Amino acid sequence: MNPEQFQTALAEKGIELSDTQLKQFHDYFEMLVEWNEKMNLTAITDEKEVYLKHFYDSISAAFYVDFTKFDTICDVGAGAGFPSLPIKICFPHLEVSIVDSLKKRMTFLDALAEKLGLTDVHFYHDRAETFGQNKAHREKYDLVTARAVARMSVLSELCMPLVKKGGSFLVMKAAQAEQELQTAEKAIKLFGGKVEEHFAFSLPVEESERNIYVITKTKETPNKYPRKPGTPNKLPIE
């Protein structure tokens, strides 16, 4: 998917990109490839692949969920900024917070935000487990996103505490998502969530499977969650 095809594909879904936004995506791609030579940000560096598997894939959530109704987003384990920064470029009104445990990624994201002229973006170098116990962030976000960083039961413990009551947790997964959901149902319920919607679709060009789950926060997460760093991964609630 080259930049022109990317622009057309988004327009077909109702997302019209301005010249400024197209330039932001171009600069994002160039910077990602340039910095990737110094640090491991992504295995995907071919332009067509980046536009499809990073940019388009990140924005695909907006084909099913109305991002104009959210003000604050927290992205857990965003790595090189996916999915939240491509979404931010398309929906500039959003205030985006990214949490990642690797300091070097924060350095990249800081430089990227400056280069792209992004405002209302905040980067936190922290473990999700610690961040979720921080009163300044706990139950403060309209929407929390995670893109395939861990199993759904683990993600629920890391992300649900950050979602405000009435807000949403958006999980983006590739294949075998239904199986993961079944093992995560207990955790989702325990942390105050309810699976509201599931969207299954294929990524264009390569036709690979994608799944998006929207989990609504119906009640507060018990105070003891998330547990201390490393525990959710070692002893997932299933």
UniProtKB/Swiss-Prot annotation:
This is Ribosomal RNA small subunit methyltransferase G. Specifically methylates the N7 position of guanine in position 535 of 16S rRNA. SUPFAM superfamilies: S-adenosyl-L-methionine-dependent methyltransferases. It is an enzyme of class 2 (transferase). It is found in: Cytoplasm. GO terms for molecular function: rRNA (guanine-N7-)-methyltransferase activity. It comes from Listeria monocytogenes serotype 4b (strain F2365). Belongs to the methyltransferase superfamily. RNA methyltransferase RsmG family. Its EC number is 2.1.1.-. The gene is rsmG. Transmembrane segments: none annotated. It holds the Pfam family GidB. S-adenosyl-L-methionine binds at G77, F82, A128, E129, R147. NCBIfam families: rsmG_gidB. GO terms for cellular component: cytosol.
